[in-house]
Amino acid sequence: MLKIYVNGSSGKMGLSLTNLINQSQELDLITKDISLSDVVVDFSHPDSTMEIIKICSRNKIPLIIGTTNLNEETHIEIKKASKYIPILLAANMSIGILQLKESLVAFIRSNKEKINCLIEETHHSNKLDSPSGTAIEIKDLIKNTDKKSNVNQIKISSK
């Protein structure tokens, strides 16, 4: 049985994940002693992520980070910790976004024209971070894939 600790279990994604874990006969939700977990999933607030990285590093626990809006210092800490523990950092874990990213990479690599990009997103009224981590991740993907400098600008419109 895989033991999972969910950091940020009271948020939208955390609640969804804990419900799925509780329904599974192959997964066990760890709620108190994080050191007993086989993996930690972080859907918390950016302020909490740094501490969970340190705890996972100290206890040699693999970490999945779905928290967005992380600062530069946290990204540096993630890179350091990834030398000692497995870390998956993903702003959006949906299959649809994965397929979108793959399509964007294929398009950017094959494109020969100069283009401008607009990433437009609409959210529910309770959305905490704007632009979303997904939009920022897509912008970074385009920028890092554009080896021929065909993308003039990339804008994000978030409502």
Predicted feature residues:
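Rossmann-fold NAD(P)-binding glycine/threonine-rich loop
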Residues: 47, 53-54, 67-89, 95-107
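A general structural motif
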Residues: 1, 36-37, 60, 84, ...
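C-terminal substrate-binding/catalytic lobe of Rossmann-fold NAD(P)-dependent oxidoreductases
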Residues: 3-34, 113-159
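Short, conserved beta-strand edge motifs with alternating hydrophobic and charged residues
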Residues: 66, 90, 118-122
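Residue-level signal for alpha-helix termini/capping positions
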Residues: 57, 109-112
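Glycine- and other small-residue-rich loops at beta-strand/loop junctions that grip anionic moieties
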Residues: 41, 66-68, 92, 127, ...
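Electropositive phosphate-/nucleotide-binding environments in soluble metabolic enzymes
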Residues: 7, 11, 15, 43-46, ...
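Rossmann-like NAD(P)-binding element
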Residues: 34-51, 57, 61-64
